Amino acid sequence: MTVYHLNASYEGYAKHFHQYYKQPYKTTHTFANFGYIGLIGSIGAYNDVSIGLGQKVWITTEQDITSRLGNPWTYVLRDVIQFADSIDSALTMLVNAHRTCSVHLGLGEYHRNTSGREDDDDNVGFLGIEYSAKEFNVFAWEDMYNTTQHPVLENVVYWDPYVQPSNNTCLGSLLVEHYGRIDAPTVIRNITSVLKTGNTLNMVLDYNENAVYIAYSAPEDPQGPIEAFNRVHTRIDMAKLFAEPVPTIDDE
């Protein structure tokens, strides 16, 4: 399971900017791009071979590791999700990209055509990536930073939304509290809402279910909460979504 929590100025996004639109792809993977109409590239996406990709900001004082010259990271993520066949081919594309800004990435893959149980953790591969023009660091759960605020947890790769230690609630402490029973409802009710992260877009990708739970901010809703992490999430069955026929234009 993967959580992508976009934090931005949620007051500026109107309800008309997130709509369903399907475009036919005959020579590449079908994929779902979770973002906004008019946003070029990807910030969170998932394709029909169960590869998922998302990002969060990577704040670093080492300014020399970034560049404004190259392929914007949103374009790179879009290419990866459309053309990568596996987590290995996705890594190759990311390594060879003309990288620019520094971002944290989460890259996952579900091995759906295996003989193991559907809920077997061995069916899921997931990596955390520090991505920038001059640095590219890959972390499995065993390689994650191991500190008091950021403990290593088996089969869990995570980036804290806040610099630790700080007065902000740490993601690590919440993961420890709920470890062993972390599912999409638990993440939505007890983790992202407590951290108050994902105010513009909050997306939980469940690889076992082949489903996405997603919520957007709603600045035009006079009654409900504005922030995405506080709103009701919509569950999308990705197998059914990818099977939806492409709309046709009536020549008449």
Across the structure, where does each feature detected by a protein language model lie?
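Cysteine-dependent hydrolase recognition
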Residues: T30, A45, I51, N71, ...
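A contiguous strand-loop segment
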Residues: M1-P72, T100-H104, T200
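C-terminus-biased signal that marks the final domain/tail of proteins
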Residues: D79-E252
